[in-house]
Amino acid sequence: MMEQGKDCREVVTQLAASRNAIDRAMGLIVSTNLEHCVRESLEKGEDTQNLVKEAVDLLVKSR
């Protein structure tokens, strides 16, 4: 876009849209994986607190 001489606002808008799409995809992937891991841990009688904390920490760190 920059090589095409697009306005700076257009470039920033596209970058923000890309970031938003990636953030949503990451959220979906992490939540799906977390759900699977929690179910598996519950079936084994294991504590799920650490799994949830790790998932939240990963999401926070990725921002």
UniProtKB/Swiss-Prot annotation:
PANTHER family in the record? TRANSCRIPTIONAL REPRESSOR FRMR, TRANSCRIPTIONAL REPRESSOR FRMR-RELATED
- GO MF terms held by the record: DNA-binding transcription repressor activity; metal ion binding; transcription cis-regulatory region binding
Q: Which GO terms describe its biological process?
A: negative regulation of DNA-templated transcription
Question: Which superkingdom is the protein from?
Answer: Bacteria
Q: Which GO terms describe its cellular component?
A: protein-DNA complex
* Name of the gene this protein is made from: yrkD
- Cysteine disulfide links: none
State what protein this is by name: Uncharacterized protein YrkD
Question: InterPro entries this protein is in?
Answer: Metal_Tscrpt_repr, Metal_Tscrpt_repr_sf
